[in-house]
């Protein structure tokens, strides 16, 4: 099974990291698909926070995709599941034909339960 997570406001949250760790432990291939860019005007952007989380939970660097602000449905076609906090990205993933199912993640605020 191939599982993808957005990073900002999704995999950067501890409960989603715990979910990713469970998927990895069950043998799933886990990926990060982020709208971020890794280069801007020829300069490499470090994305240290993203790589730190990926290293800590066991996501391989080759499983990280920077979409450079392009729609994620173009990058998630071969995944089974993608989690994201962006409703438009999830709607697009579920609207365009592919095997990937998109699930909206709504981070919890002020001791509320997360919705995913």
Show where each model-derived region lies.
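A short acidic, amphipathic alpha-helical/loop segment
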Residues: 15-23, 75, 91-96
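Short, hydrophobic beta-strand segments that form beta-sheet elements in well-ordered domains
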Residues: 32-33, 65, 80-84, 100-105
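Noncatalytic linker/hinge segments flanking ATPase motor cores
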Residues: 45-52, 73-81, 103-108
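Alpha-helical substrate-recognition element adjacent to the catalytic core
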Residues: 1-69
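Short, well-ordered alpha-helix to beta-strand connector turns
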Residues: 27-28, 61, 77-79, 97, ...
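Asp-based, Mg2+/Mn2+-dependent phosphohydrolase catalytic module
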Residues: 87-116
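Conserved Lys-Pro-Asp/Glu-containing loop-to-beta segment of HAD-superfamily phosphomonoesterases
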Residues: 64, 69-93
């Amino acid at each position: 099974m191939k599982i993808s997570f957005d990073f900002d406001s999704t995999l950067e949250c501890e409960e989603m990291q715990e979910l990713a760790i469970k998927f990895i432990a069950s043998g799933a291939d886990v990926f990060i698909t982020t709208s971020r860019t890794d280069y801007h005007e020829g300069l490499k952007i470090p994305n240290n926070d993203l790589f730190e989380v990926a290293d800590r939970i066991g996501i391989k660097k080759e499983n990280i995709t920077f979409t450079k602000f392009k729609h994620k449905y173009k990058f998630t076609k071969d995944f089974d599941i993608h989690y994201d906090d962006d409703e438009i990205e999830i709607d697009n993933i579920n609207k365009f034909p592919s095997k990937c199912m998109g699930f909206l993640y709504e981070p919890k605020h002020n001791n509320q339960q997360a919705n995913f």
